[in-house]
């Protein structure tokens, strides 16, 4: 145990050899989340409306106030203006054309997705007016909320980035420092020392796990501070991350052992981290996309990790179709990664041919 403690202490001292890489690996996902949360789509859209001069215009304003989620915020925030010119924004004006009242919406945007969202909200407001005029013959819509309260998309986005933060820290730092052992010639110490290689690898994996948890905790804290929503179990969320951290650590260390160079190891970790994040339910649950994409996404370890974390942020709602299969999948990936790391370490460090 004392020898393991000395190995672990030596691993942490390696921070001094690459402090910038440590900061990039640990803080990059959190900084990315903070920036993305500022520009991300929100449920409530500002809609500029020319001050109404008719009773229909006043009714339209009232209808706008009714458009929203039954368990969440309004979808439209009306802003009354006097100038019908949209400028670089958008404006709605109730006008008379051929004796008929028309809601004229003028856009100064080039963002087609934002225009689509604003048109949908205007249609919803007009549907409210239409239903009032139709009376008993109006279109009846029954809404059945899936959750007690609406949760903003920034929560899902941040939750899905927690595995990214853990993976990136473990893979990038593991690969970079392992490659440095070859570049600096210190790999000879591992080849000649009497300490068993499982103990050496255990110290490296333990250190990477602590670093990965640090990156994930930082992102988790900013997720809670920005959205005001915290998981129902902090411990459960981070226990779920353990298989992914071990997988990432093994991939990073193996990259360093194979390439013997810091830059390729750095790039392999970066590319694999973002590929796993993008394909592995980074922007939405895999079940919400095409069948082909879902099948590919379920091959990525991030997807079962996110599905297991989901209930702790979304009132206990389960989304994993096959929880047992997902657990077995992660166990299999983890065991394969550990075996692969041992094999590569033996070939690249302990082999007599080296």
Predicted regions and their residues:
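Hydrophobic alpha-helical transmembrane segments of membrane proteins
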Residues: 41-47, 147-177, 245-257, 339-346
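Alpha-helical transmembrane segments and their short interhelical loops
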Residues: 197-270, 274-277, 324-327, 332, ...
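Hydrophobic alpha-helical transmembrane segments of multi-pass membrane transport/permease proteins
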Residues: 6-44, 155-173, 213-216, 273-278, ...
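Hydrophobic alpha-helical transmembrane segments of multi-pass membrane transport proteins
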Residues: 150-223
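Extracytoplasmic/periplasmic domains immediately adjacent to an N-terminal transmembrane anchor
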Residues: 1-152, 325, 354
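Transmembrane helix segments
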Residues: 33-44, 259-302
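Short hydrophobic, aromatic-rich alpha-helical segments embedded in or entering the lipid bilayer
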Residues: 84-87, 286-328
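Junction motif at the cytosolic side of a transmembrane helix
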Residues: 9, 15, 41-42, 313-317, ...
